[in-house]
A protein has these predicted regions:
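Aromatic-rich carbohydrate-recognition surfaces in CAZymes
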Residues: 71, 359-364, 368-379, 383-483, ...
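Catalytic cores of carbohydrate-active enzymes
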Residues: 151, 165-166, 397-398, 513-630, ...
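Carbohydrate-binding/catalytic loop surfaces
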Residues: 349-358, 399-426, 458-464, 483-505, ...
Length: 804
């Protein structure tokens, strides 16, 4: 069953049935002002932080309410409906709707009772407020007299928990006032005399606004209970039923913004208005409203600027292959998903309510990888930020606050950091993600000078990027377990594996090995011969250790417990086969050809399903060791033998590196949202964004996916597809092209911007192989192999690669 389709030309997903199996969401805005909106207009808004900047209220995992609601009432028949199917929820036999989710905007189209409406929700580019632009058309043969009512429900405090939990405080600090064409919602209004920097108990007066432009306000209400009415709901508010709002203002309890306008429409006539929401004081709110004297012209200009901004970002890399599902994800939706995780980390969604008030170190450093080929300048800014969140001992701050102050932060060694963030210890993998991310940025941009840039540490001191990386490596060297492998510490990517100071992680050992390979390249560039020799020697010793300790006949084990027990050996009754060590043995370059083939074949036989490969098998139940916290989850769920989607990207990359194009593409299709559009009732999540995990074969809901949008899956799958399947592998000197594709692909093309040049790449596959290069031509000149030195590139470079 499907609920919509992809419009690739407009870069939209069009929902044609509003009764989706879950709220299907989109992101609006920027790091300064963010918003989520569902296909039924549910969602919330926030300034900078989903935890401490909440503006519009949302009740999580309930009924996708409240939201950005626009009600339409026929004043003759007294019938009313909403511009989105919900909250009124008219019978779908008579109410027709479409939701168009695009790049940072969402449009709702509705037809009911001879009235056509179209509302576009967006945050203007470089602005910190949102717009609900409404067009109403009379499609009937007679004049229509309508009342249009917009409704926004404000939080009583910027802090999500204070608004939702601490009601004995937050219910008694708010008020609303009506000002010409808007309602102003005030928190701590009794402190209106207090200046910034002179807060009372860290509190200042704060104003939000909800405004109407394009028509005069006919009636208004600023009190939630008065608008809805007792024992009424969002589907039947008394203010809408009555056709006139009460004029009641909030003083304590719950404020809202409700504004109504009269609209008289002749047959065929269209009128436009806009509702505006933001967190602004009186003067700034008034100035914003004045911009919309001509609603149609202003909104059209803003939407054009917004789509132009995102189209320009996405156009840096476009593919045309025989697979529409692949093209849809790589060209638009996987790319846009990468940007959203890059911006918001794991801070705000319909699953993350905003309580993680900052960036997870490992999450964000990995998220950067997904946008490097599209926006290297944005990636650079975030890499600098994350390097400045590295502690001088080489470890990363597990949580990097949105208010991060480099050089002055506490660390997990300080009780104050633990108390403030809830993160009690370092994680084994955090700083190791810097190596591939920094390498990928420099390889894509050619900015080798970055390696010498001086960046502060989180707590004290500063050093070059090169030194930052050396200290990241030293952190692992200084935290080895009894066998000489890296200790698992508080977690090692898998937050449900607590291996501690003496338990050891094969996954981190493989990351550590890979980090040495990358750092050797930087050491060579720096002509740091002594350090290169050190790395060569240590990497050889580490490789021998991993092979001797972790290779178990046909698989790599997962590690060792603090008691020295092996995790993931063939004879274990539970969790005897793990996914990540197999893929990372290939990615790191440690596995021999024979090991790689055996391990990956084992993955295909033991772990793979029609929805992707499960994280491990069998699930924990009776035989979990003390640190195997996955046992708290139901079998087939999350880390306990669920299909953890981020790992699918590494699996795609590993198979591609082995030249297994058919298998790499199979793994892509098993987990790709676009490939499951016709199974939406099973997957449940949006068919245009990735989720954190899918329930595995041990679950009665096998195939159901969870935790949308904000997941490392977006970046790992993007890297797996771009570097793996498509074979775009830049290095310091140029670009290697090594596709690993389905054998039945005849050819594909890529449009790629690279270091100020545009590459038009055609890959031909006349012999229908999965990998391999017969010849590479650059501007009709034959290259020695499948590598393009950057000096061979021109402003418009024509590339032709023939596979064989």
């Amino acid at each position: 069953m499907n609920f919509g389709y992809f419009d690739d030309e407009k870069r939209e997903y069009v929902i044609t049935r509003p009764d989706t199996p879950a709220p299907w969401a989109n992101y609006l805005g920027s790091p300064e002002y963010g918003a989520l909106i569902s296909n039924n207009a549910g969602g919330y808004s926030f300034a900078r932080s989903g935890a401490n900047g909440r503006i519009l209220r949302y009740i999580f995992n309930q009924f996708d309410q409240p939201g950005r609601y626009i009600y339409l009432r026929d004043n003759e028949s007294k019938d009313y409906w909403s511009a989105s199917w919900q909250p009124v929820g008219k019978d779908l036999e008579s109410y027709k709707s479409e939701c168009h989710h695009g790049t940072a905007y969402t449009k709702m189209l509705a037809d009911y009772s001879g009235i056509h409406s179209e509302v576009c929700y967006y945050v203007p580019l470089n602005q910190t407020y949102e717009v609900w632009h409404l067009k109403v058309t009379n499609a009937s043969a007679c004049e229509r007299n309508l009342t249009i009512t917009g409704y926004a429900e404000f939080t009583n405090n910027n802090n999500y928990e204070q608004d939702q939990v601490n009601l004995q405080y937050s219910q008694f600090i708010t008020s609303t006032v009506f000002e010409t064409n808007r309602i102003r919602h005030i928190i701590h209004g009794n402190l209106d005399w207090v200046k910034e920097g002179e807060e009372v108990d860290n509190k200042l007066a704060i104003s939000r606004f909800f405004a109407l432009t394009g028509a005069p306000v006919d009636s208004y209400c600023g009190d939630k209970e008065s608008f809805l009415g007792r024992y009424h709901g969002y589907h039947n508010p008394v203010g809408v039923e009555n056709g006139k709002l009460s004029g009641e203002m909030c003083y304590n309890e719950n404020g809202c913004g409700a504004l109504a306008a009269q609209m008289l429409l002749k047959p065929g006539e269209t009128k436009e208005i806009a509702f505006l929401v933001g967190m602004k004081e009186h003067e700034e709110a008034e100035a914003i409203c004045n911009r919309y004297a001509d609603v149609a012209a202003q909104c059209e200009t803003e939407l054009k600027e917004l789509t132009g901004y995102w189209y320009e970002k996405l156009e840096h890399f476009q593919v045309h292959t025989p697979s529409r599902e692949f093209d849809t994800m790589i060209n638009t939706w996987n790319a846009y998903n990468c940007f959203m995780t890059f911006i918001w980390s794991r801070a705000a969604s319909f699953f993350y309510c905003g309580l993680r008030n900052g960036y997870g170190y490992r999450d964000t450093v990995q998220d950067i990888q997904g946008v490097i080929h599209l926006a290297p300048e944005m990636a650079l800014e975030k890499i600098r930020f994350m390097l400045s969140a590295q502690v001088d001992n080489g470890g990363g701050l597990p949580l990097v606050k949105f208010t991060h102050n480099a050089g002055h932060e506490d660390t997990p060694d300080d009780a104050s950091y633990v108390q403030e963030t809830g993160h009690p210890a370092y994680r084994a993998d955090d700083a190791l993600w810097l190596f591939p991310t920094v390498y990928k940025y420099i390889a894509e941009s050619g900015n080798l000078a970055f390696i010498d840039e001086v960046i502060p540490f989180a707590n004290k001191d500063e050093a070059t990027v090169y030194e930052h990386l050396k200290r990241a490596l030293a952190f692992s060297v200084n935290h080895l377990g009894p066998h000489g492998l890296p200790a698992g510490l508080y977690a090692d990517w898998n937050d449900c594996l607590r291996l501690g100071k003496n338990g050891e992680s094969s996954f981190v050992a493989l990351q550590f090995y890979y980090a040495m390979t990358i750092l050797k390249q930087f050491a060579a560039y720096k002509e740091d011969r002594a350090y290169m020799d050190y790395l060569e020697e240590e990497q050889e010793k580490l490789g021998t250790l991993i092979n001797n300790l972790c290779w178990n006949e046909d698989r790599f084990i997962r590690g060792f417990t603090e008691a020295g027990e092996v995790i993931g050996k063939r004879t274990d009754p539970e969790a005897n086969m793990w996914l990540n060590p197999q893929s990372w043995a290939v990615i790191s370059g440690l596995a021999t050809k024979q090991q790689a083939e055996l391990a990956m074949e084992n993955v295909r036989k033991r772990l793979n399903t029609e929805y992707g490969a499960i994280l491990m098998d069998p699930p924990y139940h009776l035989h979990a060791f003390d640190g195997a916290l996955a046992v708290i989850y139901n079998p087939g769920t999350k880390e306990n033998a669920g299909i953890f989607s981020q790992s699918q990207g590494w699996l795609i990359l590993a198979e591609a590196l082995l030249g297994h194009g058919d298998q790499a593409f199979t793994y892509f299709m098993e987990n790709a949202p676009s490939a499951q559009n016709d199974r939406a009732e099973i997957r449940k999540l949006e068919p245009y964004c990735y989720g954190q995990f899918t329930e595995g074969k041990d679950s009665p809901h096998f195939g159901r996916s969870h935790v949308h949008w904000l997941t490392g899956t977006a970046s790992t799958v993007m890297v797996g597809c771009v570097e793996g399947i498509l074979g775009m592998r830049p290095d310091f000197g140029g670009l290697r092209i090594a596709p690993s594709i389905p054998a039945d692909w005849d050819q594909f093309t890529i449009e790629k911007d690279f270091r100020g040049k545009h590459l038009h790449i055609v890959v031909e596959n006349p012999e229908h192989v999965q990998s391999g290069c017969k010849a590479l031509y650059v501007n009709e000149e034959k290259m020695e192999d499948n590598y393009i030195p950057v000096e061979k590139m021109t402003d418009q470079t024509k590339v032709r690669l023939v596979m064989a």
